[in-house]
């Protein structure tokens, strides 16, 4: 049976049926609709003002690749300039290939690229070194705790180096729905109260962040990359399989099978969520060591690095779990091997 005509142009044959709306579109019309929806998200949310210098968190994966491609196409209409900022976490056999994809993208799209490395920023620590230090727990999920916190700090540092005024990341609707589920399952009222918006305004001197793909499903991100023939890196991080996010992802897939709108329902619910004032987190202060935003004496990054340098990474994870990155999980303090004493906690 031949494919129906495209519901938009009526000239070409439809190449896909949009997962949520059911609309049959050709590849060109789907890509145009996808870009228009991202443009609407940016304009309606007033995410990127004219003249903004935007640091795109570039990982080489499908989401950041699609985000960079779409924003590059929209940049003249938005009046913004783009800088690619990639983070080298120091994961052997994984990150090198991903960074190679980012470099190809930067060359093809003629966008400036800056790479910042954990090893340079965090006193010699790489994710492989962190994994060896936390190996006593017998689990890899704590690696995602460290990596999420440190990557956020590294992206901020890279954005400042290039003179950016805003940071954008490629989180899509599925990512956000998983985060809502994770925070709900943990009973993390603070993150539920503040995590549903399109980004953060940049309190305490931090750069404003936003997620222009927040309402785009993962399926459509993949379809856009396919029709635009984008070059991206698709392997999963070697430390990801045991992360708590994987359980939320499995649950979300089951929910979506029963209710196709489950992903966007969760995203919109998080937007509308209004918890009692008593449940909202206090206004953050400043880290006593590096000056970054912090709800305690030390920010997340300094607390984790402090635990690593003292040889007590599991204690660093367990002590303020709800204040850590969304991959954080309860930990049992262990006695991992002590890293070299020469690795000092850096001053940012």
Swiss-Prot record:
The EC number on file is 2.7.7.-
Localization per Swiss-Prot or TrEMBL: Cytoplasm
Which pathway does the database say it acts in?
tRNA modification; 5-methoxycarbonylmethyl-2-thiouridine-tRNA biosynthesis
Q: Which CDD domains match?
A: CTU1-like
Q: Which UniProt keywords apply?
A: Cytoplasm, Phosphoprotein, RNA-binding, Transferase, tRNA processing, tRNA-binding
Task: Show the GO MF annotations.
Answer: nucleotidyltransferase activity; tRNA binding
Name of the featured protein: Cytoplasmic tRNA 2-thiolation protein 1
Please name the taxonomic classification of the source: Eukaryota, Metazoa, Chordata, Craniata, Vertebrata
């Amino acid at each position: 049976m031949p494919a129906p005509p495209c519901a938009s142009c009526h000239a070409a044959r439809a190449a896909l049926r949009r997962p949520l709306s059911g609309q049959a579109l050709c590849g060109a019309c789907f890509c145009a609709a996808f870009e228009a929806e991202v443009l609407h998200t940016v304009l309606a949310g007033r995410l990127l003002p004219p003249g903004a210098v935007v640091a795109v968190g570039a990982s080489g994966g499908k989401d950041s690749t699609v985000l960079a491609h779409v924003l590059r196409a929209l940049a003249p209409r938005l009046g913004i300039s783009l800088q690619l900022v990639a983070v080298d976490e120091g994961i052997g056999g994984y990150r090198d290939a991903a960074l190679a994809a980012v470099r190809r993208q930067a060359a093809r799209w003629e966008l400036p690229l800056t790479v910042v490395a954990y090893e340079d920023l965090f006193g010699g620590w790489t994710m492989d070194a962190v994994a060896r230090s936390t190996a006593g727990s017998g689990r890899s999920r704590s690696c995602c705790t460290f990596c999420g916190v440190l990557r956020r700090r590294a992206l901020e540092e890279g954005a400042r180096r290039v003179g950016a005024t805003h940071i954008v990341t490629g989180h899509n609707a599925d990512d956000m729905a998983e985060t809502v589920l994770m925070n709900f399952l943990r009973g993390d009222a603070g993150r539920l109260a503040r995590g549903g918006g399109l980004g953060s305004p940049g309190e305490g001197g931090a750069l404003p962040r936003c997620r222009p793909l927040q309402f785009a499903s993962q399926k459509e991100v993949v379809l856009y990359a396919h029709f635009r023939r984008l070059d991206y890196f698709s392997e999963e991080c070697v430390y990801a399989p045991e992360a708590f996010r994987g359980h939320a992802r499995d649950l979300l897939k089951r929910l979506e099978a029963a209710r196709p709108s489950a992903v966007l329902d969760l995203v919109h619910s998080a937007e509308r969520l209004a918890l009692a004032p008593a449940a909202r987190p206090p206004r953050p202060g400043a880290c006593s060591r590096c000056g970054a935003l912090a709800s305690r004496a030390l920010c997340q990054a300094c607390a984790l690095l402090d635990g690593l340098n003292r040889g007590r990474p599991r204690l660093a994870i367990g002590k303020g779990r709800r204040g850590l990155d969304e991959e954080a999980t309860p930990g049992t303090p262990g006695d991992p091997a002590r890293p070299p004493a020469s690795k000092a906690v850096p001053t940012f």
